[in-house]
Amino acid sequence: MCRGCHPHGSPIAVSGLAKPGRAAAFRKRSMANRTVSSIESEIEIFLSKCPFLASSEDEPSCVAKFHRSEIEVGELLGKGAFSEVYQVKAVNPCFEHEDEEENLRCVIHEACKTQDNDADQFIVKHLRPELLTQRTAFNNAAADLVLESKFLAALDHPNIIKIHGWAANGAKSFGDGSHDGFFVMLEQLDDILSRRISLWRKDPSSAPPMEQRLGYATQIAGALQYLHSKNIIFRDLKCDNIGFKDGAIRLFDLGLCRELPENSSRDDMFLMSGVGTPRYVAPEIVLGTGYNLGADVYSFSIVCYELLAIAKPFDLYNIGMYRMLVCEDGERPQLVASWPQELQTLLTSMWDAESSVRPTMDEIHSQLSEIHSKATPGALTSLLSSLKFPKRLVRMATGSFSEGTSTTVTSAASLNK
């Protein structure tokens, strides 16, 4: 993310033919400038249909404003289809702001000064530079990033990533013609769930006990319960968008979140763009029949299964096979026989083909919390000991729950039909 590669500031007028590099940079800046009004218009229309975000439109007191030149970045930490994430090395405030805003900026400045290589605290997220040559993609991705920042500023839950700063000029920051003109500053996570599950699959002995994984699932459910209470659908729940910070779960990458109409019921279906990663996408999205908050419930069932079974369902399926075998024929992952019956029943209900049959996140969080409390070794050991079971049987009983394994349904049998 070298700023020298994408010059900031006003275009320089030259006589005669412009040099190819300068001409390309000018075209990129011009394209970004032209799309600012389009982005702002799209966001205004979106907010007019979002009671929760509209009610949170006042400037949040917990988000600091920065100019891009005030932030020094380090290594590239990751990239998605439309955005990049960089580590923040330093924050050097050089523009004056109101007292309250200046205090926030100073707090982040001091935090960056005191952090060491093992305690990085902040990241910046902005668009990828390639989008400057793709006007439609740039416009859509820019609007999604601005909306994500607004959602994060309005939301407050311990299992949703925290926003600490953003571009001082809001969406107008795209007008400087650079891909990183608008950005968000977020807390830096320690790891992501997909990476941890991959490590656990390679080395099962490194996996945390079942009760701890159930605790993670309960935290994810709590974050979704909170979003759904605001009528917000996540739309892109997957293990790649779930992280860890100081041992706790964080949902992140909220760019595809949308707010459903305030007076909608759980049976109302909405035609929105089909988004998400196939393995986690609800059948109704793939089949184009409309969807609602129940789509998140289906996605959570697959995340939950992957987390608890340490197995990746439908791993060998392409999108065509997923549509035919899972969405049309109703294939689902194979449950682990040693799991409690109430957990198996809950998962089965969450991935039901009919959205209206799936439980709400309120119900799911409540049931998972109860299952988790029963699964803790202390609770089970105490119960069995009170019933005068021999210590050897107590150890066997409390260890068996976390030792269950799963045989994931793969594509081989289906392909041979």
Indicate where each model-derived feature is located.
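Conserved short submotifs of the Hanks-type protein kinase catalytic core
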Residues: 175-192
